[in-house]
Structure formats: structure tokens, C-alpha cells
């Protein structure tokens, strides 16, 4: 994911 984005920013996981």
C-alpha cells in the first residue's frame, strides 16, 4: 500500500 501507499504509506504502509
Swiss-Prot record:
The modification D-phenylalanine is found at residue 2. It comes from the Eukaryota. Ocp-2 has L-Phe instead of D-Phe. It is found in: Secreted. GO terms for molecular function: hormone activity. Keywords: D-amino acid, Hormone, Secreted. The keyword Secreted applies. One of its GO terms (cellular component) is extracellular region. Its main location: secreted. Cardioactive; has both positive chronotropic and inotropic effects on the heart. Ocp-2 is a 1000 time less active than Ocp-1. This is Cardioactive peptide Ocp-1/Ocp-2. It comes from Callistoctopus minor.
Amino acid at each position: 500500500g501507499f504509506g504502509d
